[in-house]
Amino acid sequence: MGQKINPNGFRLGISTDHKSRWYADKLYKSYVGEDVAIRKLLSKGMERAGIAKVEIERTRDRVRVDIHTARPGIVIGRRGAEADRIRGELEKLTGKQVQLNILEVKNPEVDAQLVAQGVAEQLSGRVQFRRAMRKAMQTSMRSGAKGIRIQCSGRLNGAEMSRTEFYREGRVPLHTLRADIDYGFYEARTTFGRIGVKVWIYKGEVAGTRAERQAQAAARAGVPGRGGRPQRGGERPSRGSRGDRPTRADRGGDAPTSEATGAATEQAAPAPAENQEG
């Protein structure tokens, strides 16, 4: 089952989250159509921006759109002109106030969607598919990925019959639910037809569900002190000022001096025996 299913949907609530977060009763159909139209609008004409994913969150009178991109300067434009244009088109499409957030992808070499888009662009530029796949795998592994698999399907190198080829490096455990696997898909448009590019990137294992990890992080942030131990208040008293500890004099009598101790030692010592004449 793990080999065929979409890894993002297979791990919802464990290592991934929904890309659209809202609730609707009677307007469910129209909201789904709006989400598809929003993503299609953002992908059209934004191929050079390197958009990894688009997250949509709705309230009663507002729509929040988060764009994760590798090149935020292209999406923002000069003095924010491009961002204003996108916001205006989204408000016209949805009929509500739109809050547009543009977020930068810190490490695009280990983002599956961006890797798939990069391979597809090379295939469109008549680069050998094996060379493009191996170069992408080497770059991802050097950037910190623990495993990667890239698959290309279509008329590879202009062959008469379409076929599927893939390359893999490292571990890609698709059946393991706690494995953090990123998945991306992109289509390359060539003179021989379209070639589909799929990418799986294994980033390591996660402990517990997504909600449990957030609760643990909040608990760690709320505990004072270092290392989860509460800090001790006040100063530690010195050795000579420890409260009302009784001294030897209070317990009865003064402490024996060195002279008295020496006299007692002499009295206790046995006298040497005298030699007796036979």
From Swiss-Prot:
It comes from the Bacteria. Residues 214-223, 259-278 have a biased composition (Low complexity). InterPro entries: KH_dom, KH_dom-like_a/b, KH_dom_type_2, KH_sf_prok-type, Ribosomal_S3_C_sf, Ribosomal_uS3_bac-typ, Ribosomal_uS3_C, Ribosomal_uS3_CS. Coiled coil: none annotated. CDD domains: KH-II_30S_S3 (cd02412). GO terms for cellular component: cytosolic small ribosomal subunit. One of its GO terms (molecular function) is mRNA binding. Residues 232-253 have a biased composition (Basic and acidic residues). Keywords: Ribonucleoprotein, Ribosomal protein, RNA-binding, rRNA-binding. Residues 38-106 form the KH type-2 domain. Residues 213-278 are annotated as: Disordered. HAMAP family: Ribosomal_uS3_B. PANTHER family: 30S/40S RIBOSOMAL PROTEIN S3 (PTHR11760), SMALL RIBOSOMAL SUBUNIT PROTEIN US3C (PTHR11760:SF19). Part of the 30S ribosomal subunit. Forms a tight complex with proteins S10 and S14. Binds the lower part of the 30S subunit head. Binds mRNA in the 70S ribosome, positioning it for translation. This is Small ribosomal subunit protein uS3.
